[in-house]
């Protein structure tokens, strides 16, 4: 914003794009109010308040010399969030000015902290020349940082995509548009409103935009920052115009999204928002991608959580599937691996292409990975070039990375992999741009442009001449010093420089009477005098001028270079994509060799057959790991899994789902063999957790997740259910578990692994021929239990709950009391069932009533001899005698 003084007032000019984002009517009112009060403030505060009015919901970092200052409410908020000092200095409009500031050179660390906290920041720089300014130096907002529009390397996680998402509502659908500003990837999709929570979990946006007249419960549950925009910013006609202008097309038919009206509205609002924050035309955003739900296996929020894809149930990053597989050697590969794990492919042709590439790379990854390791983050460096926010070391890093690609092309042998052949072609480097980078940028440039030392020698004649003046400075000063010593006869005369007084001749106080007449005193100290001569002054002006002009010339050349590199952006994006895919595929090959994984086989026939499958993460933590097989088909749809706690039921179910997921990502799997038919979704209901924030009990969460499965699972879905019904009374829980299993068998007809401790439920295989029983084996050893962890056909004989309780450290007296109570309950149950003519196959087969325990024995079992005093021991003896 520029402030102009006119008849004592202030005219505030506001760019059209700002008006478009904030609402013309509302903004006009705000500016009118501001216009009427600005004259009561100091000139500098008038300028600040005018800028702040444009960004009322952002922290404004206002550049003043070597600091970014924040004022008033911004200062208080920044002080609280950043732990910086809040002060009061001077006054404006009769009130003290509240201030807080951060050093300019250390600003990035504070910006990074604010970004993590979800705050938006407007960076206001000095753009005018202080020497030519009559009032406050002209300032403009040059950069806006919001959580979803970060591109600076210091503000981003190398292993995660940073996504900005916009949501628009249409007739019965929601339009989603998301953009990764650091890569230029722009993706549209449409979903039914009921799938929004699932999509937010999958996309995991850093920031969400949505119209002010839209509400959905899922928005309350997501933790990222959210920004409401005026509904008119999602106008369909305006959005179409914004998008066609960006892509220089007549319409959107070529992108396959012309019929996706809600998604187009979201995309238009999103693109306008990004243009506003970045203050550029976004040249690296060159296309739209339409994402169809059928492209990927659907994983709901519960499934992503329960499978611990990249976060444990405790919220930690390790041990997870991602942490196990992530031996990638590039930042781009690390991000792509995470994305692939969250987006398993559904189309078998695409999966087979990846698997074939992995197979080919098993013989090549040793030669490829050292070259890949030398490739920097081309994707994000190229994005910063596009946005013209690149720093000198972005360009040197880009240059060094691009120089690795020809060698990578030569070493890669695609053989019979069409995917690898395509990636090899994508590694073609735009040579003209690379030559420009090689010629223009020093081998090791300065970190920031203002320090100089960025543009290579020989690139620009004018810059070379200015540098020559500076480099010859030392030689001139030596000659001048020798000349003046000889001319003055003062042998200890020195010529020196400091940043305050510039160049000077230093002479001791005792010899100051002998100086030549043309010496002019510059500074007097205790023991020395400092002088300047016309010749030295002329040289000083020349050197200092050369330094300033050299820095200005370097900035001009650097900015010009960024402009000249724009045509290479599309090619660099292809390079980045190829490197990322090669890195992940080579990682899959390396992991397959090291971890002894095999290639899965895909079939058009329904079913799932895994021989000696292993849990990829657990097998690395527990050795030896017992492998187990699983077989599901249209004739064996539901496996009812029984067995003791800690026997491995949950591990068995999770490993089945993870093997299916890995296979659909194009990765080899931990098994002896795996044949997988068509799968469209994976559902899980495992573990117990409540939702206190949402006001839902553990049982309510369980039932909600189960309802989602029953409503959405198909005959091509894989369903994992663990302990359904345990959060309520025994009969309620058993009834619910039976009804859920029946629904899955009769209606959904999904492939289901159903773990339970309700032994009565095992009879369901007698009623439904497509259900079968398996169990995790265990054997008793003395008073304890040994878990065998192997899966056997048929139901378990007992749960071994008391033995597990003993292993957990439950006091022996409690365990013994439980055993006695168990006998009573089992006797009662057998009697009731016998009277009804319905004996339980488990109870009837296993109940062997123990004789009643003598009171003396019970008392002795409760005694801890080591803790008794002599007096207490005597009392116990008297008590025992009475019990006989």
Swiss-Prot record:
UniProt keyword list: ATP-binding, DNA damage, DNA repair, DNA-binding, Nucleotide-binding
InterPro entries hit by this protein: DNA_mismatch_repair_MutS, DNA_mismatch_repair_MutS-lik_N, DNA_mismatch_repair_MutS/MSH, DNA_mismatch_repair_MutS_C, DNA_mismatch_repair_MutS_clamp, DNA_mismatch_repair_MutS_core, DNA_mismatch_repair_MutS_N, DNA_mismatch_repair_MutS_sf
Keyword DNA-binding: yes
Keyword Nucleotide-binding in annotation: yes
Pfam families associated with the record: MutS_I, MutS_II, MutS_III, MutS_IV, MutS_V
Role: This protein is involved in the repair of mismatches in DNA. It is possible that it carries out the mismatch recognition step. This protein has a weak ATPase activity.
Family membership noted in the UniProt record: Belongs to the DNA mismatch repair MutS family.
Name of protein: DNA mismatch repair protein MutS
Organism: Methylobacillus flagellatus (strain ATCC 51484 / DSM 6875 / VKM B-1610 / KT)
Gene: mutS1
